[in-house]
UniProtKB/Swiss-Prot annotation:
Organism: Sus scrofa (Pig)
Residues bearing the modification N6-(pyridoxal phosphate)lysine: 357
Name of the protein described by the UniProt record: 4-aminobutyrate aminotransferase, mitochondrial
Gene symbol of the encoding locus: ABAT
Gene3D superfamilies: Aspartate Aminotransferase, domain 1, Type I PLP-dependent aspartate aminotransferase-like (Major domain)
TM regions (residue ranges): none
EC number per UniProt: 2.6.1.19, 2.6.1.22
Residue numbers bearing the N6-acetyllysine modification: 252, 279, 318, 413, 452, 470
GO MF term list: (S)-3-amino-2-methylpropionate transaminase activity; 2 iron, 2 sulfur cluster binding; 4-aminobutyrate:2-oxoglutarate transaminase activity; identical protein binding; metal ion binding; protein homodimerization activity; pyridoxal phosphate binding; succinate-semialdehyde dehydrogenase binding
Binding residues for pyridoxal 5'-phosphate: 164-165, 381
Segment annotated as transit peptide: 1-28
Length: 500
């Protein structure tokens, strides 16, 4: 399929690269690379098992005041640098998960440290304003230097938020207001609308819906949770909305061996999208918008072809639905383009696009026609954080200056090639290797083996993340280089060789 042609090309070239199959073959040593010792370490250093004794003690203390069962270990961020995360027991790990894909240019980047230390920036970091009513003098300037400098095609409007969930939540509200405005025309709010909205009834609160996909993750607030379908524990016991849920393609790998089957699978899913839009219109729960991730991340790193997304965009236009692309995890450069949807090759890729994580702040871009028609309709106290815009402007400068998008593409190719090698040698443990840039993943036989591999890797000095039922995902920073990929591949090759 077109969405991950790189995987196909690498798989084909791999078949001719027999040296990768030679027993004892090693990826080139990380020692051959030039390491900036002021920013990056030269490799992992493990002193205890993870979590170590200090982490376990702190976990006990935290568990007294909140459920701390999700905590992996406690970190020493003062000592963490570049691609390496250091814990409170002194263990230094190559971090290929980067705080759930949210660290853009590594830990404690010197340029960001310098920025924070500059006297003229002190007030920005200590005075957090209510941006909707009292923004600082340089607010527009910093937005232009940061977010607006990477605005996606066709979207000139921008609203900042604090996180991915509130970005999607407010994007939903924006879509609903846009849709109702289309229906209302130039008329003002009616007296009935103003009264019924206060008691959560129509017509003031119209019964619109957002179509989402099975396997999606869009956040944990009430509206977002209605479009999140990745893990039951995220949703259980919480009331939700009757909104349509379409199947997302489940592609078969290797892609070049299942072209016809995958095309049929995508066609089936697109047909179901259209059927659901029609069905919910008849139910008087009109689909006002469609939300989709360019790569379903939390749900298992599920890919679809570029053609699938182009056709999905066409469906949204045909039925008058807003098209919302959730780039919270895929945005920021890890796929080799700043926004993953750029791979689709569309001049009009979306009506609304949300972001967070690597972007340092949350928020969403949107077209002019989605602009709220009155103040306080999309609003909260902080509406983001100017200090994050300041940091992001420097992050974007570094991405451009160091050509980190090209780096993500190249280092990702090294990583993906190595994973295909490991898949060929250890098919009993690794399958469905896939990825775009460094945004890579593979499947394991089951959840138990997946979790065991992640745990062993952590104790060998490598941080990995899980997703879906049995997948391992890679979310390194943009300063993840070829030699970091080789280092990981050597360590993980040894793990697989000894795995029982």
């Amino acid at each position: 399929m077109a969405s991950v042609l790189l995987t196909r090309r690498l798989a084909c070239s791999f078949r001719h690269n027999h040296r990768l199959l030679v027993p004892g073959w090693r990826h080139i040593s990380q020692a051959a690379a030039k390491v900036d010792v002021e920013f990056d370490y030269d490799g992992p250093l493990m002193k205890t098992e993870v979590p170590g004794p200090r982490s376990r003690e702190l976990m006990k203390q935290l568990n007294i005041i909140q459920n701390a069962e999700a905590v992996h270990f406690f970190c020493n961020y003062e000592e963490s640098r570049g691609n390496y995360l250091v814990d409170v027991d002194g263990n230094r790990m190559l971090d290929l998960y980067s705080q759930i894909s949210s660290i853009p240019i590594g830990y404690s980047h010197p340029a960001l440290v310098k920025l924070v230390q500059q006297p003229q920036n002190v007030s920005t970091f200590i005075n957090r304003p209510a941006l909707g009513i009292l923004p600082p003098e340089n607010f527009v300037e910093k937005l232009r230097e940061s977010l607006l400098s990477v605005a996606p095609k066709g979207m000139s409007q921008l609203i900042t938020m604090a996180c991915g969930s509130c970005s999607n939540e407010n994007a939903f509200k924006t879509i609903f207001m846009w849709y109702r405005s289309k229906e209302r025309g130039q008329s003002a709010f009616s007296k009935e609308e103003l009264e019924t909205c206060m008691i959560n009834q129509a017509p003031g609160c119209p019964d619109y819906s957002i179509l989402s996909f099975m396997g999606a993750f869009h956040g944990r607030t009430m509206g977002c949770l209605a479009t999140t379908h990745s893990k039951a524990i995220h949703k259980i016991d919480i009331p939700s909305f009757d909104w349509p849920i379409a199947p997302f393609p489940r592609l078969k790998y290797p892609l070049e061996e299942f072209v016809k089957e995958n095309q049929q699978e995508e066609a089936r899913c697109l047909e179901e999208v259209e059927d659901l839009i029609v069905k919910y219109r008849k139910k008087k729960k009109t689909v006002a918008g469609i939300i989709v991730e360019p790569i379903q991340s939390e749900g298992g790193d599920n890919h679809a072809s570029d053609d699938f997304f182009r056709k999905l965009r066409d469906i949204s236009r045909k039925h008058g639905c807003a098209f919302l692309v959730d780039e919270v995890q895929t945005g920021g450069g890890s796929t080799g383009k700043f926004w993953a949807h750029e791979h689709w090759g569309l001049d009009d890729p979306a009506d609304v696009m949300t972001f967070s994580k690597k972007m340092m702040t949350g928020g969403f871009f949107h077209k002019e026609e989605f602009r709220p028609n009155a103040p306080y309709r999309i609003f909260n106290t902080w509406l983001g954080d100017p200090s994050k815009n300041l940091l992001l402007a420097e992050v974007i400068n570094i991405i451009k200056r160091e050509d980190l998008l090209s780096n993500a593409a190249h280092a990702g190719k090294v990583l993906l090639t190595g994973l295909l090698d490991l898949q060929a040698r250890y098919p009993q443990f690794i399958s469905r290797v896939r990825g775009r840039g460094t945004f890579c993943s593979f499947d394991t036989p089951d959840e138990s083996i997946r979790n065991k591999l992640i745990s062993i890797a952590r104790n060998k000095g490598v941080m990995l993340g899980g997703c879906g039922d049995k997948s391992i995902r890679f979310r390194p920073t943009l300063v993840f280089r070829d030699h970091h990929a080789h280092l990981f591949l050597n360590i993980f090759s040894d793990i697989l060789a000894d795995f029982k």
